[in-house]
Design a protein with these regions (language model features):
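C-terminal effector/interaction modules appended to NTPase cores
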Residues: 2-151
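Helix-rich effector regions associated with P-loop NTPase G domains
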Residues: 2-17, 46, 81-95, 103-127, ...
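Phosphate-binding glycine-rich loops and their immediate beta-loop-alpha structural context
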Residues: 121-124, 133-186
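Catalytic P-loop NTPase motifs of RecA-like helicase/translocase cores
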Residues: 138, 167, 198, 272-275
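Canonical P-loop GTPase G-domain recognition
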Residues: 166-220
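A conserved segment at the C-terminal end of the G1
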Residues: 223-235
Length: 337
């Protein structure tokens, strides 16, 4: 043994003290969190898997495997969590339980602002149901924007025209004609009336064994639709946390409901409107499934699809392969680049 390399105990302790002083607050928090985790494991606390159904800052409501709701605090080293996240949580003997880990997400529902910042809204969906009210008259551009946003998220989308009881027979026929192009593109379209209980069974079938979100502008009847599919006791569960004053969520917090018939439904005020940000042109082509096949067929690479010669999109409109309203929506979003 080389005695010169042996560090005296007091000197070693002094070095540890100096190193500890050099630790940043963030580093110390990480160490403390890891120590707490080890302490919990040492005490034999059980690791549980759960589903985040609502979030309130430092707290979250977790749906357990036996369909109980547990209020948890969030481990500091976790990323921002959203409704639909699958997580690992641990029960505490004293105080609130704690969320300790995030299970990798299968999909993300998000929007992008003009600062190109990604705003995560929900996780692990496999379909989005875009709800449009027929009165007042819906906008094709708004609908196309929602469809483009879902394509950007790589989510299957379907369209619901709600409140059709407000239309007379002539207006209903016009609606069917306007919606026809979306069916031709490949989107599933449903016509609903909660008052007449019309069209609900067909949509209910689509909710089975899926994780779905109702998306659409305010005032289109999403809340009324949710009541048609969500058991009353589940809605009550979503209101539990109001009594704790840990988060008033009537207008600001997303909620997840488990359907009695199977499947999960997400309702969120945060998905009333979507921004696509400044999408690159190639990204925008990807968001319009009917226009995407023509993206490399124009004569000019920077074609604006107006009056340029040999514009593939204008030619497709003339031959009826693309609707003029869809092209106009595409160009309007393209102008926002």
């Amino acid at each position: 043994m080389i005695l010169a390399n042996i560090i005296p105990a007091q000197q070693l302790n002094d070095r540890k003290t100096m190193n500890k002083r050099r630790l940043t607050k963030q580093q110390q928090n990480r160490i403390n969190a890891k120590q707490n985790e080890n302490l919990i494991l040492a005490n034999g606390s059980e690791q549980n898997q759960g589903l985040l159904i609502a979030s309130y800052g430092k707290y979250a409501d977790i749906l357990t495997a036996n369909n109980q709701i547990v209020r948890c605090t969030l481990r500091q080293n976790l990323p921002a969590l959203v409704v639909g996240d699958e997580i690992i949580w641990q029960a505490e003997q004293a105080g609130l339980s704690v969320v300790t880990a995030l299970i990798p997400r299968k999909s993300e529902l998000f929007r992008i602002n003009y600062q190109q910042e990604k705003k995560l809204i929900a996780a692990n969906l496999n379909q989005a149901i875009i709800v449009m009210a027929v009165q007042p008259d819906f906008s094709e551009f708004v609908l196309d924007s929602y469809l483009a946003a879902m394509a950007l998220c790589n989510l299957k989308a379907m369209v619901v025209f709600n409140k059709i009881d407000l239309l007379n027979s002539q207006q209903l026929e016009i609606l069917h004609q306007r919606a026809k192009l979306y069916k031709e593109i490949g989107y599933e379209v449903y016509y609903l009336s909660c008052i007449l209980e019309q069209g609900l069974s067909g949509l209910k079938t689509k909710l089975l064994d899926n994780i779905s979100a109702f998306i659409g502008p305010s005032g289109v009847g999403k809340s009324t639709l949710i009541k048609q599919f969500v058991p009353e006791e589940s809605i009550v569960l979503g209101v539990i946390s109001e009594a704790t004053n840990l988060g008033r969520h009537t207008t600001t917090t997303s909620h997840l409901y488990r359907l009695q018939t199977g499947g999960v439904l997400i309702d969120s005020p945060g998905i009333r409107g979507f921004g696509l940000g400044k999408l690159a042109r190639q990204q925008l082509y990807h968001c319009f499934i009917d226009i995407k096949p023509y993206k490399d067929l124009c004569k000019f690479r920077n074609c604006e699809h107006e009056s340029e010669p040999d514009c593939a999109l204008q030619q497709a409109v003339k031959t009826g392969k693309i609707s003029l309203s869809r092209l106009n929506s595409f160009k309007k979003l393209m102008a926002a680049e």
